[in-house]
Every structure is written in C-alpha cells, then in structure tokens.
C-alpha cells in the first residue's frame, strides 16, 4: 500500500550560489558523512560534478521528506537521510538515528528516482507500507 509520494525539482544554480555564499558549511549541513566524502572527491576532480551531486541529494531528500509526510521536522533531518546507490547504480535511501527507528516502526520502504540536467535536479519518491 502506498504510504506517500514526494517529488522535488531543484535549481542547480541556487545550489551553486549557496556553495559560493556559504562554502563547505552548506554541504556539511545537507549531506550525511558518506555523501560528504563523495561530494568532496567529486568536487576536487570536477567542481561542476560536485554541485550536481549536491543538488540531486538535496532534491532526493526533499522528495523523501514529502513522501513520509514530515517535511523537515523531527525525526527527519538532512544528515539522518542519506542517498546511496545499490551495486546496480539504483539510488536508495539509507536512514540513520531516530529517523531510521521511526521509519522501521511503521514498516515503511522507499523507492527513489533521481535525475539531473545542466540547470535542474529532480527526484521522485514513493514510500510503501508493508
């Protein structure tokens, strides 16, 4: 049974401007530790790739927060929600802390799709209840 659906579109230019204004602090606020390491590595090789990586993660977390119906209210926090990839490359949500407990207690599972183009990153999330 579908518990919730969320979608988000993110303007990559706004993410670029936030990084220019706030530097690494912006990424450190939005990304979980594993994501932060990937972002730093991608940004070092090709800064634009780092910006797009951050934009897709931002968009995916927004879509997920809408699908679970919490928005950005506890226990949903940026850093407790991590976007990872399965070996196949499929994006998935990995939860931590109180958010992981909240999600598991409700018997929920998530399906996520992300995409990006030059100026936009978009995500679609479906959360199901067992």
Curated annotation (Swiss-Prot):
Location in or out of the cell: Cytoplasm
Organism annotation: Acidovorax ebreus (strain TPSY) (Diaphorobacter sp. (strain TPSY))
Catalytic activity: apo-[ACP] + CoA = holo-[ACP] + adenosine 3',5'-bisphosphate + H(+)
Main localization, broad class: cytoplasm
SUPFAM superfamilies xref list: 4'-phosphopantetheinyl transferase
GO cellular component: cytoplasm
Key words, A-Z: Cytoplasm, Fatty acid biosynthesis, Fatty acid metabolism, Lipid biosynthesis, Lipid metabolism, Magnesium, Metal-binding, Transferase
One MF annotation (Gene Ontology) recorded for this entry: holo-[acyl-carrier-protein] synthase activity
InterPro entries: 4-PPantetheinyl_Trfase_dom (IPR008278), 4-PPantetheinyl_Trfase_dom_sf (IPR037143), ACPS (IPR002582), Ppantetheine-prot_Trfase_dom (IPR004568)
Record function comment: Transfers the 4'-phosphopantetheine moiety from coenzyme A to a Ser of acyl-carrier-protein.
Designated name of the protein: Holo-[acyl-carrier-protein] synthase
